C-alpha cells in the first residue's frame, strides 16, 4: 500500500481487478515509446556487445497470434445468433408491454439439440440444419424491425450485437445459396467480430484465429512493423520496414534476412537499388549447377534468420502468446506489446549481466548488497 501511494494502512481494497485492465491499457499507449527510448539510449552499448554478423542486419518475418475462441461452425454461430435475438425480442416486448412474438424457440431448441448430440454429422444434415437456423434468424430479424418501428429500443451492447448478427446472416445466406464455404470478411465469433481466419498452412494447424503481426529484429531488439486482424502478404511491407530502419538508425542495413516469401522481384530490385543484400536464392527454378560457396552463404544466412523464429517461440512459450485469452482489441494489442518488451528485456539482461552493488542506509544502519543477474535458457530468468 505504501508503494501505490497510500499515506496510511487501510483494510479496504484500494482498487479492484478491473483497475489493472485500465492500467495495462495505459501501458499499451507508451510501449512503442519505451522501445524507442531503450534503443536510442543503449544503441551504442548494444552494438558494441553484439557479434559482427548481427550489426547492420535486419531480420524480418510474420506470425499469427492465436486468440482463445470457440472453434467456429456455421450451425453453432447461427444458433447463438438465434438465442441472442430471442433475448432482444423479449426485452423489447416488455418495453412495449405486449405479448412476445412467436419465435418457435422450443422447436428450434429441440432440433438443435438433436443435431448437436450426433457424433458424426453428414453434409445433408448440416445443410438442413443451416437452412432451419437461417429461417429462424430471418423471422426474428423481421420481428425486431417491426418492434423498433413501434418505439422499442436496444441498449448499446444489443445494438452492436444486432449489427453483427445482420452481417452474419447475410454471409451465411450467401454461402448457403451459392453452396460455398468462402466469403469475404467472414465472421467467426459474435462476441469478437473483428477476428478473422488466418490461413497459415502449418502442419499443426492450417487456419489460426487471431491477429497477424509483421515483426523485425535490428540490433537484437524486436519491433512490430504491422499489426492487423485481417490476413495480409508480409512481402508487400518490406519497403516500409526498410524505411523504418532508416528513420531509426539514419542509414540502410547492409543485409536483410528473410524467408522465401519476401524474395519477390520487386523486393530484390528495391534492395539492389539501395545497396542492400537480400539473403537467400532467387525465386523460380533452381540452377542446375550451384556454387558450393554460395550454397554455404545461403545456409549460414538461413541459420542467422532463425533468430526471429526463436524470438517467436520464446514469446509464444513462456510469455503466453501461444493462446491469448484477452477479449478486446486494445487488450490483445497490449498483451502482444508487453510480450515483445519482455523479450527485449531478456535480451538486455543477457547482454548487461554484470555485477550490481547496492548501498542502503536506514536509521544509522548500513546494508551492502552484492548480486548479479544470470540468464539461463529461455524459461528461467533470475
Predicted feature residues:
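Helix-centered, glycine/charged polyanion-binding patches within enzymatic domains
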Residues: 260-330, 334
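Flexible loop/turn segments at secondary-structure boundaries
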Residues: 196-198, 222-224, 231-233, 262-267, ...
Amino acid at each position: 500500500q505504501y508503494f501505490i501511494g497510500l499515506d496510511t494502512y487501510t483494510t479496504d481494497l484500494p482498487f479492484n481487478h478491473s483497475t489493472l485492465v485500465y492500467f495495462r491499457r495505459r501501458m499499451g499507449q507508451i510501449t512503442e515509446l519505451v522501445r524507442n527510448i531503450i534503443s536510442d539510449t543503449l544503441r551504442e552499448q548494444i552494438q558494441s556487445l553484439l557479434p559482427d554478423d548481427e550489426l547492420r542486419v535486419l531480420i524480418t518475418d510474420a506470425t499469427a497470434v492465436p486468440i482463445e475462441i470457440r472453434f467456429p461452425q456455421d450451425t453453432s454461430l447461427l444458433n447463438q445468433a438465434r438465442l441472442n435475438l430471442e433475448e432482444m425480442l423479449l426485452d423489447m416486448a416488455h418495453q412495449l408491454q405486449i405479448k412476445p412474438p412467436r419465435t418457435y424457440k422450443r422447436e428450434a431448441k429441440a432440433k438443435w439439440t438433436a443435431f448437436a448430440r450426433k457424433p458424426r454429422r453428414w453434409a445433408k444434415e448440416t445443410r438442413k440444419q443451416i437452412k432451419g437456423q437461417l429461417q429462424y434468424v430471418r423471422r426474428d430479424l423481421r420481428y425486431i424491425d417491426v418492434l423498433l418501428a413501434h418505439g422499442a429500443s436496444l441498449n448499446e451492447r444489443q445494438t452492436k450485437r444486432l449489427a453483427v448478427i445482420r452481417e452474419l446472416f447475410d454471409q451465411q445466406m450467401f454461402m448457403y445459396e451459392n453452396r460455398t464455404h468462402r466469403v469475404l470478411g467472414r465472421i467467426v465469433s459474435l462476441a469478437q467480430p473483428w477476428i478473422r481466419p488466418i490461413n497459415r498452412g502449418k502442419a499443426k494447424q492450417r487456419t489460426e484465429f487471431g491477429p497477424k503481426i509483421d515483426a523485425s529484429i535490428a540490433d537484437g531488439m524486436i519491433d512490430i512493423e504491422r499489426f492487423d486482424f485481417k490476413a495480409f502478404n508480409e512481402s508487400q511491407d518490406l519497403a516500409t520496414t526498410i524505411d523504418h530502419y532508416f528513420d531509426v538508425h539514419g542509414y540502410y542495413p547492409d543485409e536483410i534476412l528473410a524467408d522465401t516469401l519476401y524474395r519477390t522481384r520487386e523486393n530484390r530490385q528495391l534492395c539492389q537499388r539501395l545497396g542492400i543484400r537480400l539473403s537467400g536464392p532467387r525465386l523460380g527454378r533452381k540452377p542446375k549447377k550451384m556454387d558450393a560457396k554460395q550454397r554455404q552463404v545461403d545456409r549460414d544466412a538461413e541459420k542467422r534468420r532463425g533468430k526471429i523464429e526463436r524470438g517467436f517461440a520464446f514469446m509464444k512459450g513462456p510469455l503466453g502468446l501461444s493462446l491469448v485469452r484477452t477479449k478486446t482489441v486494445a487488450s490483445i494489442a497490449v498483451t502482444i506489446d508487453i510480450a515483445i518488451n519482455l523479450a527485449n528485456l531478456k535480451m538486455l539482461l543477457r547482454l548487461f549481466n554484470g555485477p550490481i552493488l547496492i548501498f542502503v542506509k536506514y536509521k544509522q544502519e548500513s546494508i551492502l548488497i552484492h548480486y548479479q543477474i544470470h540468464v539461463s535458457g529461455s524459461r528461467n530468468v533470475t
